[in-house]
Regions:
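Glycine-rich phosphate-binding loop and adjacent beta-alpha segment
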Residues: 218-279, 316
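N-terminal Rossmann-like NAD(P) cofactor-binding module of classical short-chain dehydrogenase/reductase
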Residues: 93, 212, 235
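Glycine-rich beta-strand-centered segment in the early N-terminal region that forms part
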Residues: 25-42, 54-96
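A short acidic, Gly/Pro-enriched loop at the edge of an enzyme's catalytic core
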Residues: 201-211
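C-terminal hydrophobic helical "lid"/dimerization subdomain
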Residues: 222, 265-316
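Mid-domain Rossmann-like dinucleotide-binding core that forms the NAD(H)/NADP(H) cofactor-binding site
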Residues: 118-194
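A structural motif shared across PLP-dependent enzymes of the aminotransferase-like
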Residues: 44, 95-107
Length: 316
Protein backbone atom coordinates (compact mmCIF):
# COMPACT_ATOMS: atom_id res chain seq x y z
CA UNK A 1 0.00 0.00 0.00
CA UNK A 2 1.00 3.67 -0.20
CA UNK A 3 2.37 5.43 2.84
CA UNK A 4 4.60 8.38 3.69
CA UNK A 5 7.99 7.21 4.89
CA UNK A 6 10.79 8.97 6.77
CA UNK A 7 14.10 7.96 5.22
CA UNK A 8 17.68 8.67 6.15
CA UNK A 9 20.00 10.26 3.59
CA UNK A 10 23.78 9.74 3.17
CA UNK A 11 24.53 13.16 4.67
CA UNK A 12 22.58 12.14 7.83
CA UNK A 13 19.68 14.43 6.96
CA UNK A 14 16.17 13.04 6.47
CA UNK A 15 13.42 13.19 3.91
CA UNK A 16 9.79 12.10 3.89
CA UNK A 17 8.46 10.63 0.67
CA UNK A 18 5.58 8.62 -0.74
CA UNK A 19 6.30 4.91 -1.13
CA UNK A 20 4.02 2.40 -2.85
CA UNK A 21 5.06 -0.96 -1.42
CA UNK A 22 4.57 -0.62 2.33
CA UNK A 23 2.97 -3.69 4.00
CA UNK A 24 -0.78 -3.36 4.39
CA UNK A 25 -2.04 -3.69 8.01
CA UNK A 26 -3.58 -7.00 9.02
CA UNK A 27 -7.23 -7.22 10.03
CA UNK A 28 -9.76 -6.13 10.89
CA UNK A 29 -10.47 -8.62 13.65
CA UNK A 30 -12.55 -8.33 16.83
CA UNK A 31 -13.80 -4.77 17.24
CA UNK A 32 -11.45 -3.33 14.63
CA UNK A 33 -12.43 -1.34 11.57
CA UNK A 34 -10.45 -0.83 8.38
CA UNK A 35 -10.55 2.48 6.54
CA UNK A 36 -9.35 3.80 3.20
CA UNK A 37 -7.79 7.23 3.56
CA UNK A 38 -9.44 10.22 1.90
CA UNK A 39 -7.33 13.02 3.39
CA UNK A 40 -4.49 13.31 5.87
CA UNK A 41 -3.13 16.44 7.49
CA UNK A 42 0.45 17.39 8.31
CA UNK A 43 1.22 17.95 11.99
CA UNK A 44 3.75 20.69 11.38
CA UNK A 45 5.60 20.73 14.68
CA UNK A 46 5.75 17.01 15.39
CA UNK A 47 6.58 15.96 11.84
CA UNK A 48 9.27 18.60 11.43
CA UNK A 49 10.73 17.49 14.75
CA UNK A 50 10.96 13.97 13.33
CA UNK A 51 12.60 15.23 10.13
CA UNK A 52 15.34 17.11 11.98
CA UNK A 53 16.01 14.36 14.55
CA UNK A 54 14.33 16.07 17.50
CA UNK A 55 12.99 14.67 20.75
CA UNK A 56 9.97 13.03 19.04
CA UNK A 57 12.03 11.53 16.22
CA UNK A 58 12.75 7.86 15.53
CA UNK A 59 16.42 6.97 15.85
CA UNK A 60 18.53 6.66 12.71
CA UNK A 61 18.73 2.90 13.11
CA UNK A 62 14.91 2.69 13.09
CA UNK A 63 14.59 4.25 9.64
CA UNK A 64 12.77 3.96 7.33
CA UNK A 65 9.49 4.34 9.19
CA UNK A 66 6.00 4.58 7.70
CA UNK A 67 2.90 6.58 8.51
CA UNK A 68 4.20 9.03 11.12
CA UNK A 69 1.37 11.44 11.79
CA UNK A 70 -1.91 11.61 13.67
CA UNK A 71 -4.42 13.32 11.38
CA UNK A 72 -6.31 10.95 9.10
CA UNK A 73 -9.77 11.09 7.52
CA UNK A 74 -10.93 7.83 6.00
CA UNK A 75 -13.99 5.83 4.96
CA UNK A 76 -14.78 2.49 6.62
CA UNK A 77 -14.38 -0.34 4.10
CA UNK A 78 -14.36 -3.40 6.41
CA UNK A 79 -15.47 -4.15 9.97
CA UNK A 80 -14.51 -6.89 12.40
CA UNK A 81 -17.12 -9.32 13.78
CA UNK A 82 -17.42 -7.50 17.13
CA UNK A 83 -17.93 -3.99 15.77
CA UNK A 84 -21.22 -2.59 17.08
CA UNK A 85 -21.24 1.18 16.49
CA UNK A 86 -19.61 1.82 13.11
CA UNK A 87 -20.51 0.51 9.67
CA UNK A 88 -19.13 0.36 6.17
CA UNK A 89 -19.33 3.77 4.54
CA UNK A 90 -18.91 5.83 7.72
CA UNK A 91 -16.34 8.63 7.42
CA UNK A 92 -14.05 8.98 10.43
CA UNK A 93 -11.39 11.24 11.81
CA UNK A 94 -8.69 9.02 13.34
CA UNK A 95 -5.52 9.69 15.24
CA UNK A 96 -3.60 7.72 12.64
CA UNK A 97 -0.78 8.29 10.21
CA UNK A 98 -0.27 9.06 6.54
CA UNK A 99 -1.15 5.67 5.07
CA UNK A 100 -3.58 4.42 2.45
CA UNK A 101 -5.25 1.96 4.82
CA UNK A 102 -5.72 2.11 8.59
CA UNK A 103 -6.87 -0.61 11.01
CA UNK A 104 -7.98 0.59 14.44
CA UNK A 105 -10.35 -0.53 17.23
CA UNK A 106 -13.69 1.24 16.97
CA UNK A 107 -13.20 2.54 20.52
CA UNK A 108 -9.80 4.02 19.60
CA UNK A 109 -8.97 7.70 19.26
CA UNK A 110 -11.46 8.46 16.50
CA UNK A 111 -14.84 10.03 15.87
CA UNK A 112 -17.49 9.58 13.21
CA UNK A 113 -17.81 12.80 11.22
CA UNK A 114 -21.24 14.31 10.59
CA UNK A 115 -22.08 15.08 6.96
CA UNK A 116 -21.95 18.80 7.75
CA UNK A 117 -18.21 18.77 8.52
CA UNK A 118 -15.84 19.60 5.68
CA UNK A 119 -13.53 16.60 5.32
CA UNK A 120 -10.48 18.74 4.51
CA UNK A 121 -10.99 20.75 7.70
CA UNK A 122 -11.38 17.49 9.62
CA UNK A 123 -7.91 16.49 8.42
CA UNK A 124 -6.59 19.07 10.91
CA UNK A 125 -8.70 17.90 13.86
CA UNK A 126 -5.62 16.49 15.60
CA UNK A 127 -3.73 19.75 16.01
CA UNK A 128 -6.92 21.66 16.68
CA UNK A 129 -7.89 19.17 19.39
CA UNK A 130 -4.49 19.79 20.98
CA UNK A 131 -5.63 23.43 21.17
CA UNK A 132 -8.85 22.30 22.86
CA UNK A 133 -6.96 20.13 25.33
CA UNK A 134 -4.55 22.95 26.13
CA UNK A 135 -7.22 25.54 26.84
CA UNK A 136 -9.03 23.12 29.14
CA UNK A 137 -5.79 22.23 30.89
CA UNK A 138 -4.97 25.92 31.35
CA UNK A 139 -8.22 26.24 33.35
CA UNK A 140 -9.06 29.57 31.78
CA UNK A 141 -11.65 31.70 33.56
CA UNK A 142 -13.99 34.45 32.42
CA UNK A 143 -12.12 37.73 32.00
CA UNK A 144 -8.62 36.33 32.50
CA UNK A 145 -5.80 37.82 30.48
CA UNK A 146 -4.13 35.13 28.39
CA UNK A 147 -1.03 35.41 26.22
CA UNK A 148 -0.82 32.83 23.43
CA UNK A 149 2.67 32.62 21.96
CA UNK A 150 2.77 31.28 18.41
CA UNK A 151 0.20 31.86 15.66
CA UNK A 152 0.49 28.52 13.92
CA UNK A 153 -2.57 26.32 13.58
CA UNK A 154 -2.70 25.27 17.23
CA UNK A 155 -2.18 28.81 18.52
CA UNK A 156 -4.79 30.24 16.15
CA UNK A 157 -7.41 27.72 17.24
CA UNK A 158 -6.46 28.07 20.91
CA UNK A 159 -7.11 31.81 20.56
CA UNK A 160 -10.60 31.03 19.28
CA UNK A 161 -11.36 28.51 22.02
CA UNK A 162 -9.91 30.66 24.81
CA UNK A 163 -12.02 33.60 23.64
CA UNK A 164 -15.06 31.34 23.66
CA UNK A 165 -14.24 30.45 27.28
CA UNK A 166 -14.40 34.15 28.12
CA UNK A 167 -10.69 34.93 28.27
CA UNK A 168 -9.14 38.15 26.96
CA UNK A 169 -6.60 36.86 24.47
CA UNK A 170 -3.41 38.39 23.13
CA UNK A 171 -1.90 36.32 20.31
CA UNK A 172 1.71 37.04 19.36
CA UNK A 173 4.16 35.83 16.73
CA UNK A 174 6.96 37.13 14.51
CA UNK A 175 5.31 35.97 11.27
CA UNK A 176 3.33 38.85 9.77
CA UNK A 177 1.34 36.60 7.42
CA UNK A 178 0.09 34.43 10.26
CA UNK A 179 -0.82 37.48 12.31
CA UNK A 180 -2.79 38.84 9.36
CA UNK A 181 -4.82 35.61 9.33
CA UNK A 182 -5.44 36.02 13.06
CA UNK A 183 -6.71 39.55 12.44
CA UNK A 184 -9.07 38.24 9.77
CA UNK A 185 -10.42 35.51 12.06
CA UNK A 186 -10.94 38.13 14.74
CA UNK A 187 -10.92 35.92 17.84
CA UNK A 188 -7.96 37.46 19.69
CA UNK A 189 -8.58 40.78 21.41
CA UNK A 190 -5.02 41.82 20.54
CA UNK A 191 -2.73 40.53 17.78
CA UNK A 192 0.90 41.49 18.28
CA UNK A 193 4.06 41.21 16.20
CA UNK A 194 6.98 40.62 18.59
CA UNK A 195 9.73 40.52 15.94
CA UNK A 196 12.95 42.32 16.86
CA UNK A 197 12.52 44.05 20.21
CA UNK A 198 8.72 43.79 20.07
CA UNK A 199 8.50 41.46 23.06
CA UNK A 200 10.42 43.77 25.37
CA UNK A 201 8.41 46.79 24.27
CA UNK A 202 4.93 45.28 24.29
CA UNK A 203 4.81 42.40 26.81
CA UNK A 204 4.58 43.93 30.26
CA UNK A 205 5.97 42.16 33.33
CA UNK A 206 3.25 40.27 35.21
CA UNK A 207 0.53 41.30 32.76
CA UNK A 208 -1.13 37.92 32.22
CA UNK A 209 -3.00 35.34 34.27
CA UNK A 210 -1.80 32.60 31.93
CA UNK A 211 0.81 32.23 29.19
CA UNK A 212 0.42 29.38 26.70
CA UNK A 213 3.49 28.67 24.61
CA UNK A 214 3.05 27.00 21.24
CA UNK A 215 6.25 28.42 19.75
CA UNK A 216 8.88 26.44 21.66
CA UNK A 217 11.65 28.98 21.14
CA UNK A 218 14.75 27.74 23.04
CA UNK A 219 15.85 29.96 25.91
CA UNK A 220 12.60 31.89 26.13
CA UNK A 221 11.36 30.31 29.35
CA UNK A 222 12.29 33.23 31.64
CA UNK A 223 10.46 35.67 29.37
CA UNK A 224 7.34 33.53 29.48
CA UNK A 225 7.48 33.29 33.27
CA UNK A 226 8.08 37.03 33.63
CA UNK A 227 4.88 37.72 31.70
CA UNK A 228 2.60 36.04 34.26
CA UNK A 229 1.24 37.50 37.47
CA UNK A 230 1.81 36.13 40.95
CA UNK A 231 0.66 32.48 40.97
CA UNK A 232 0.03 32.64 37.25
CA UNK A 233 0.11 29.63 34.92
CA UNK A 234 2.64 28.89 32.20
CA UNK A 235 1.66 26.06 29.86
CA UNK A 236 4.43 24.51 27.73
CA UNK A 237 3.10 22.76 24.64
CA UNK A 238 5.64 23.04 21.82
CA UNK A 239 8.20 20.23 21.75
CA UNK A 240 11.31 20.73 23.87
CA UNK A 241 14.09 18.41 24.88
CA UNK A 242 14.84 20.38 28.06
CA UNK A 243 13.05 23.17 29.94
CA UNK A 244 15.44 25.52 31.72
CA UNK A 245 14.46 28.61 33.68
CA UNK A 246 15.68 30.74 36.57
CA UNK A 247 14.43 29.03 39.70
CA UNK A 248 14.22 32.19 41.80
CA UNK A 249 12.09 33.87 39.14
CA UNK A 250 9.50 31.13 39.32
CA UNK A 251 9.76 30.78 43.09
CA UNK A 252 9.13 34.44 43.74
CA UNK A 253 5.98 34.36 41.65
CA UNK A 254 4.83 30.93 42.89
CA UNK A 255 4.08 30.04 39.29
CA UNK A 256 2.33 26.92 38.06
CA UNK A 257 4.07 25.11 35.20
CA UNK A 258 1.81 22.83 33.18
CA UNK A 259 2.04 20.50 30.21
CA UNK A 260 -0.50 18.33 28.47
CA UNK A 261 -0.31 15.21 26.40
CA UNK A 262 -2.08 15.14 23.06
CA UNK A 263 -5.92 14.95 23.28
CA UNK A 264 -8.69 12.43 23.90
CA UNK A 265 -12.01 11.54 22.30
CA UNK A 266 -13.90 14.07 24.41
CA UNK A 267 -11.62 16.83 23.12
CA UNK A 268 -12.26 15.64 19.56
CA UNK A 269 -16.01 15.55 20.02
CA UNK A 270 -16.14 19.03 21.50
CA UNK A 271 -13.85 20.43 18.82
CA UNK A 272 -16.05 18.88 16.13
CA UNK A 273 -19.16 20.37 17.77
CA UNK A 274 -17.68 23.88 17.83
CA UNK A 275 -16.51 23.64 14.21
CA UNK A 276 -19.94 22.37 13.16
CA UNK A 277 -21.59 25.39 14.81
CA UNK A 278 -19.17 27.81 13.19
CA UNK A 279 -17.62 28.81 16.52
CA UNK A 280 -14.14 27.57 15.56
CA UNK A 281 -12.84 28.38 12.09
CA UNK A 282 -10.30 26.06 10.46
CA UNK A 283 -10.73 26.93 6.78
CA UNK A 284 -8.67 30.17 6.95
CA UNK A 285 -5.74 28.14 8.28
CA UNK A 286 -5.57 25.73 5.32
CA UNK A 287 -2.96 26.98 2.87
CA UNK A 288 -2.24 23.90 0.74
CA UNK A 289 -4.46 21.04 -0.42
CA UNK A 290 -2.26 18.85 -2.61
CA UNK A 291 -2.09 15.31 -4.00
CA UNK A 292 -0.12 13.00 -1.74
CA UNK A 293 2.25 12.49 -4.67
CA UNK A 294 3.64 15.97 -3.88
CA UNK A 295 4.68 14.91 -0.38
CA UNK A 296 8.43 15.16 -0.93
CA UNK A 297 8.19 18.81 -1.99
CA UNK A 298 5.99 19.65 0.98
CA UNK A 299 8.23 17.90 3.49
CA UNK A 300 11.39 19.43 2.06
CA UNK A 301 9.73 22.80 2.66
CA UNK A 302 8.67 21.78 6.17
CA UNK A 303 12.23 20.73 6.99
CA UNK A 304 14.05 23.68 5.44
CA UNK A 305 11.65 26.67 5.43
CA UNK A 306 8.78 25.75 7.77
CA UNK A 307 7.26 29.23 7.94
CA UNK A 308 6.19 28.85 4.31
CA UNK A 309 3.59 26.28 5.38
CA UNK A 310 0.52 26.51 7.58
CA UNK A 311 -2.32 24.03 7.19
CA UNK A 312 -1.46 21.31 4.68
CA UNK A 313 -3.85 18.56 3.61
CA UNK A 314 -2.93 15.61 1.40
CA UNK A 315 -5.50 14.20 -1.02
CA UNK A 316 -5.22 10.41 -1.31
Amino acid sequence: MRTLSIQGLPDKSRQKVLVHDWPEPEGPTGNEIKTETIYSGITNGTERNQLIGGNYAPKDEQLPTGGNGYQNVGRVIEVGPDVSELQIGDVLYMSAGHAEYIVMPEDGLLIKLPDSIDRKEAALFGMTSVAMRTCRNAELQMGERVLIVGAGIIGQVAAQIATGMGARVMLCDINANRLEIAEQIGAAETVLNVAGDGWGKEIADGAFDAVIDFAGVPGMEDQLISAVRQRGRVVFIAGRDKVTYTFNLGQGREIQLKQNSHFDRDDLQNLCRLVDRGLVKIAPLIRDVVPVSEAKRIYDTLRDTPDELLGTVFVW
